[in-house]
Amino acid sequence: MRNVELETVLNNQLNIGAFQDYAPNGLQVEGRRDIQRVVTGVTASQALLDAAVAHQADAILVHHGYFWKNEPVVVRGMKRNRLKTLLTHDINLYGYHLPLDAHPELGNNAQLAKLLEIQVLGEIESLLPYGEFTTPLNAVALRERLEKQLGRSVLHCGDRAPAEVRRIAWCTGGGQGYIQQAAEFGVDAFITGEVSEQTIHIAREMKVNFYAAGHHATERYGIKALGEWLAEQYQLDVTFIDIPNPA
């Protein structure tokens, strides 16, 4: 497949025109024209780039790419090294941020719901879905399910919250700012990747279970699902490479 064809396929599948994002979605760094071997990962870190070079990839597809708003525009240091790796090895870099969070089947939020066996009911607002467990789950058991499925420890604040969780909202990655909207909507619990100092106070005062399960850990599954879809639909050789990150 040509690199520009792959961009069109991904742009259409993820409906990128519906989003105002913090970084460009699509082909961010152009490499060789023809693509057969693709590496997917959460973030276009140097470690992922090096793994893609070792894998002889034609393209890298990530959730966290480059050229974020307000980042320095000069090419030096870390940015130079990353771009040099891509350009020296003629590797294409594709990045999809909010469109990959939001996709109703392949997105990070959809995939986390699938992993946790949550029945999705709708959205409180854009990027903030809610749903229910068929059978209410003890709040501690939910933390244990998260830890088992994600393979990491999970912070749980349930000081004044319901002991059982039926209705739940979630936002993968750095979605802790949505906790108040979720609590006001009337959920028993809210899951995201990160925690801020004020998040715990809000959880306590609004009597909602809060879980911080890791930015990286909660966002592994969208990019993995997108790569699997590409492999199935277009017969590309796609490999997901997980670069461990405790954050």
Curated annotation (Swiss-Prot):
Subunit details: Homohexamer.
Pfam family, one: DUF34_NIF3
Protein name: GTP cyclohydrolase 1 type 2 homolog
Gene3D superfamilies: NIF3 (NGG1p interacting factor 3)-like
Coiled-coil spans in chain: none
Keyword Zinc belongs to the record: no
Keywords: Metal-binding
InterPro entries from the UniProt entry: DUF34/NIF3, DUF34/NIF3_sf
Binding of a divalent metal cation 1, residues: H63, D101, E219
Similarity field: Belongs to the GTP cyclohydrolase I type 2/NIF3 family.
Gene Ontology CC entries for this record: cytoplasm
Residues holding a divalent metal cation 2: H64, H215, E219
The keyword Metal-binding is assigned to this record: yes
PANTHER family per UniProt: GTP CYCLOHYDROLASE 1 TYPE 2 HOMOLOG, NGG1 INTERACTING FACTOR 3
A GO term, aspect molecular function: metal ion binding
